[in-house]
Amino acid sequence: MEVLMLGQADVRRLLDPDRLLTALEAGFRAISEGSVDVPPRVAANTDAGFLAAMPGYARDIGLATKLVSVFRGNHERGLPSHQALICLFDAGTGSPVAIMDGTHVTAVRTAGAAAVSVRHLARPEARVLAIIGAGVQGASHLEMLSRVRDFGEIRVASRTLASATALARTDPRAHAVEGFEAAVRGADVVALCTHSGDPVVRREWLSPGTHVTSVGYAPPSGELDRAIAEEGRLYVESRAAAFRPPPAGCAELAGMAPEAATELGELLLGRARGREDPDELTVYKSMGHAIEDLVSAVLVLDAARREQIGTGFDF
């Protein structure tokens, strides 16, 4: 039995962003249809970070698990804070099929899921994007959100003006802004991409009709102002995952009723309503979901087989 190994360079080459958006939508529909099995993530904590396991199965899609380590201090060592491996298995036999880099997958699928929310919830005429956070996720959001809306202005703000400026230089539409409030006032879409344990944007800074995405994970609190979650029309990947007690669930939503949120899959299936008013505040809060990793890894593996890329080893 041969197992295919794919490094990060392979994954970067093979993971098509536009196909990923389509695959993520299929994954969200599967979640809301109940055709998935995804247990709560488990983690082993160390003094410096943690290692989490995220297994998931989706009928007619596949079976996979991701191992992801999150070590916040890695930036000081020149290493990513998030590093991951994804293992794909044959859903009929349980035999291992592929092992691939999951670090790039995690970065792109997270931003891709946010882009799905922008595609279906932001106002069609949205032209101003504010990105809060200029790290890996800030860069991924700049790429992926631009695929679903024609932004004319992109504002980037971060803890340091230097990091915001560095990211802004990668896109002619982007410019660095000093201060989070200045970045988000008047923006049509606000993307929160930080590791902050405290809210980085206040509800009163947001204009009517804003769409907010938040992908940060920093229990026991987080980057999203609770008032934004409570006052906006809230969307999540999975209520079962988002409303588990932290740290398995979303810290910013702790204590809220699960019925306060709509799953993106319900919206895509036509079972729930989306934006109904141009002045409505819409909010997407991400926890990260194993099905996002699964659909991404399946795309990569299919492309690797077509292009005969990767290194096989006998299992």
Label every model-predicted segment:
Residues 121-128, 150, 207-208:
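Short helix-loop-beta connector
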Residues 133-135:
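Glycine-rich Rossmann-fold phosphate-binding loop(s) that bind the pyrophosphate
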Residues 147-170:
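NAD(P)-binding Rossmann-fold cofactor-contacting core
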Residues 1-105, 115, 125, 262, ...:
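N-terminal ligand-binding/catalytic initiation module
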Residues 218, 222-315:
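Adenosine-phosphate binding glycine-rich loop
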Residues 138-139:
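N-terminal Rossmann-fold NAD(P) dinucleotide-binding loop
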Residues 172-255:
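Rossmann-like adenosine-cofactor binding region
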Residues 129-130, 282:
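Conserved beta-strand elements of the Class I
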